[in-house]
Amino acid sequence: MSDVAAVAARMEQLLREHPRTFYALVRELGDAEYRVILQAWGSLREARRLGRDEHGLYQLRRT
């Protein structure tokens, strides 16, 4: 598994727990390089995995 895929999987796990801001996700993933975080975020967006709740926080879309 690539670093990007691993970080994307961690993002998905965090968003399963509860909706978060992008900033909160970045703080939770502090051990990952910011560039890898952005690439992982982009991969989730391209896959249309991200949605927002009524407060504007990011969450996983229901599939």
Provide a role label for each language-model segment:
Residues 32-43:
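Short amphipathic alpha-helical interaction segments
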Residues 17-29:
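Short acidic, hydrophobic short linear motifs in intrinsically disordered regions
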Residues 26, 40, 55-56:
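Short loop/turn and capping residues at structural boundaries
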Residues 1-7, 52-63:
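Short, cationic-aromatic polyanion-contact patches
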Residues 48:
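Glycine-centered, phosphate/nucleic-acid-interacting loop/turn motifs that mediate DNA/RNA or nucleotide
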Residues 23, 34, 52-53:
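A local structural micro-motif
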Residues 2-18, 39-40:
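Positively charged, polyanion-binding regions of nucleic-acid-associated proteins
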